[in-house]
A protein has these predicted regions:
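Hydrophobic ligand-binding cavity/cleft-lining segments
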Residues: 1-38
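Generic anion/oxyanion-binding catalytic loop in active/binding sites
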Residues: 7-9, 18, 47, 101, ...
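Residues at secondary-structure transition points
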Residues: 14, 76-79, 83, 107, ...
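Short, flexible helix/strand-to-coil boundary loops that buttress conserved ligand/catalytic motifs
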Residues: 23, 33, 62, 71, ...
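Hydrophobic-ligand binding "helix-grip"
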Residues: 30, 38, 48, 52-96, ...
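A conserved amphipathic terminal alpha-helix motif
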Residues: 103-129
Length: 129
């Protein structure tokens, strides 16, 4: 299966701590996305977001700085995982979030890329306004 890598960056009007918490706290994640989330805040812990559409495991967690997760969509072939990396850096009064996702199946790349914009970056901007 051919895969692709996605790179996106977004500036958010909140501290790296607040952005990290929104991504890693189940209640805050549900508040900004409007969808159920179960997220373990520990390395090796599992997560499930958007009513089990996206699932995976926390591979590396550096509070307020970095999140690395194995990540898969429910409709991907069994056993197919990507790796999603969120890097958070202070930027003025906000946060620069640099996002990379590797091993995305080529046939769903465009949908996944747009999904991060629609379901994460735009919603985080609105949440922190």
């Amino acid at each position: 299966m051919k895969t692709k890598t996605l790179h996106q960056s977004v500036k958010l009007p909140a501290s790296p701590h607040d952005v990290y918490e929104a991504l890693m706290d189940s209640k805050k994640h549900a508040a900004f996305t409007g969808a159920a989330a179960k997220i373990s805040p520990k390395k090796g812990g599992k997560f499930s977001t958007f009513d089990d559409y996206a699932t995976g495991e926390n591979l590396e967690l550096v509070p307020d700085k970095k999140i690395v997760q194995s990540w898969r969509a429910a409709d991907w072939p069994k056993g197919q995982y990507s790796v999603a990396t969120f890097e958070l850096k202070p930027a003025g009064k906000g946060t620069q979030l640099d996002f990379t996702q590797t091993d995305i199946p080529e046939e769903v790349y465009d949908d996944i890329a747009q999904g991060w914009v629609d379901w994460y970056w735009d919603k985080l901007k609105a949440y922190f306004k």
